[in-house]
Each structure stands twice: as structure tokens, then as C-alpha cells.
Amino acid sequence: MAHREKASHLGPFKPTLILHGGAGALSRANLPSELWTRYHASLSRYLAVTRELLNSGSTALDAACHAVALLEDDVLYNCGRGSVFTERGTIEMEASVMVCSVDPGGPPAGSIKRGAAVSLIRNTRHPILLAKEVLVTADEDGGMGGTSTMHCHLSGRDVEEWGWAEKALEKKPDHWFWTQRRWEEHRRGLHQQSSYNFADLIASVDPLSEQLHQEDDGLDGVREIPSQGTVGAVCMDSWGNLAVATSTGGLTNKKAGRIGDTPTAGSGFWAESWDEDTYNNRAPFRSTQGAQPPLVTLVGRMPVLYQLVTQTSNLLGSCLSPTESDEEHQQYRAEAPAPAYTAYKSPPLLPRYDTSTQQPIRHRRHALAMSGTGNGDSFIRVNACRTVASICRLDYPSPPLAEAMRVIAGPKGELQRSAGDRWGKTGEGQGGMIGIEVIDEQEPDVECGVDSKGETKSKKKTGRVAFDFNCGGLFRAYYEVDEKTGTEEPKVMVFKEEY
């Protein structure tokens, strides 16, 4: 009975997620089997735990942040406790979150700001939870609490102290984040391996620290672990809400004060949703010969123009629509659905028609969320994640997220091209992306099936995970769906092929 009551609170979508643990010049030579076994086990565990949260009714935002918080406590990854050192021997962490939804009313939390980030974080155990608090702080007063509550990117000591004092986030001393392998990596990069070892570092803070006697981490014989360990999670909950959460320690021996792509909206993370029309695969931007079509025809063919005209007309009246009467315009106008999270239904199907062909125009909601990992400066230069979203949103017909990712993050994609003749020499341009795409399309006369009692039953709607990378490997964990049977299988991979 309790299970039935819990299930009644779930929505019409089948939850899913995808995680990443970094991307870069990975190979079997620098990723021995014993180290890969550790990565495989940890990613498998975090994937299963987060999926269980989603299946039990957790929101996408809560689930994504929970997954990343687990990764932040794992020294395998370049975030939280496994963060790399700056050239000054300090640690400066970054994190970001962003949300969107196929529900026109938006997700239950974070929809006012949509995205938030923190940077130059030194002593907060979970930077991702600090970013989450920055995101949702505007929800408390509906965005009317003043300028200071609407900032989307905060950095440094002040935001940390706010998190500790007002949000009860956990504070840790500097040395809690230090790990021997990251320190040795830092010293090798400065060509100062033996001048000041990890024991010297710890003893300088606390001569009696237990960190002087490292516990067995099961990695005997492994000299170093990959530094390209930025982590991310993209989740979709049962209500069609998407959330992306990303966290990193940055680049090894980076300049102190450097801001990377992880807290830069559009570069290392992005989430977006929009309304779009489908025209039975007829391209709306096809050029026409002869006389120019009337405005109403252009509106019907161009979704972006249609949205601009209808939204402006809704605000200022039919005087802005000289080509049609108010009655004629009604067929293009949809009432704004009430933003009720628990009562979400698919957008209503309105009888609208293409004026040039008289064929019905179908309406749908499109949402996607992405997290990137790799050389952050390259992601910033090409605004990687938002560019992928733009391809999906502005091209017609809208390509799948996986195809748009390939253009930017795939082999010979925009990230790789941005490195020019430095590709393969400096690490520039290397990286990968993960994401989820969901399209909520309501079509007429779709049979959902009938159960044993003769009642109509609906099939759970699904999202699609996507990923791509242009380098040696991308640590990733997701659920692979068999298109024929609909069955799922958890997958944990690093290379294009199985390890």
C-alpha cells in the first residue's frame, strides 16, 4: 500500500540520468586495470544510488546534486576532496547547476534564476550544494527580494561564509582537501618533486595529523590518477524536469584566481527548454520564388518569429497584427498553462494549420541539459554547451542532441578545431560532453493502450541520453535502452569501446 501511494506521486516520464567523471588523454597505458576497476565500481554505485532517488520521486535537481556530492567526496575525481592544486599550492574549486523542464510552468525549484555557479571555493566540503543554494535563494520571495538575491555567479570567501552561516553547509579545513597523489602531481608539474613532499606539507599544518599515515586506498602501484576528473550529472525526473550539476578543482597548476568553464554558463554547462512546431518534415525556412508571402505565412513557417509575434500581440493587442483580424489570430494563440508542478499535463493540442498547405501543425515542448569536461578554456572560447543547444533549437528539423554534440565535442568538431595546430600538443581542445534530451509531443488519436479493466493506460514518456568526446576517453555511466524491448542496462565506460 505504501509503495502504491509513493508511486501515485510520480509523473508521466520515466526517470533517467547520465554521469561523467572527466575526459582527456586517457589510454590503457595511463589507466591500468586496477585503477579502472576502482572507477567502474564507484561510477556504478553512484549511478544506481541516484537512479533509486529518481525512482522514488526525487526531483532532478536534488538527484543531480546528490550524485555530484558523492563524487566530490571521492578522491578519484578532480573535485571536492580530490581537487588538484594551483601553481601556488592552494585549492580553488568551482561548481554549477542549471534546470529546465518540458512543463511550461518550469521546474519546482530554481526556475527563476535557471542557473547558478560558485567559484574560488576553498573550504566548503560540497561546492555543488553551495551552487544549489545560490540557485534557489530567489525562489523564497519569487525573485522580488532585491538585486543581491538574483546574482547567478558568486565567488570567494563571502559566498562560502553565507553558505556556512545561513545554509548550514559543511566547512572543512584546507588540509582536508589535500591528497598525496594530487600534491605529487602538482610538484612534478613545477619540476620540484623532492624539495617539499606531502609529509612536509601536512606537518606544516598539523604534525600529528592522521594524514601523515595515509590509509590504504587500494591503489598500490598506481603512481598517479588522471587529473581530467571534472564531474557532472544530468538527471531527468518523473515530471520531465531536467537538471545539470557540475563540479571541478580546475586545471593542475592553474593560475590562482583562474575561472574555468564549469561555472561559466553556456560553456561548461547548460539547460534549456522551448516550444516548437513540427511541420510534417517540411522545412519552414525554404526560400520562395516570386512575391513575398504575407506576414501570417512567414509566422506559420518560422517558429521563432511566430513566438515573438504572438507573445507581443498577447501583451499589446491585435493592433500589432495588421495582416489578420483578432478572430483570425485566435488559431495561433495558446493560453498560458497554469504553473502547477504536481498537476502537470502535456501541452494542449490546439487545432492550428500551415496556411500554405493547410496541413496541421503539431506543437511540442523540447528540453535538454548538458555538462562538459575537458580543457575548460577551450569550452569557453566556443561557448560549447550553449552552442550545442542552439543547433538543436534553431536548426530545422531539430537534430538529435547526439548529432549536435558531435559537431562541437566529437572528433574534428569545433572544440578540436579551436586548438588549431596546437591540437595534440598542449591538451587544448580536448574534452567531452554528456546530456539528456526530452521531447514532449502530443499527437491526435494516439492509442495508449487499455488495461485488463478496460481503462486507458498511458505509456511512460522517455528521454534520451547523449555523449561524445574527441580525446582518448570519457568516464561515463548511464542507462542504455534497447530500442526494441525498452529494457535498460547500466553502462560504465571510458573509451569508445569496452575496456
Predicted regions and their residues:
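Alpha/propeptide regions of enzymes that mature by internal proteolysis
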Residues: 1-499
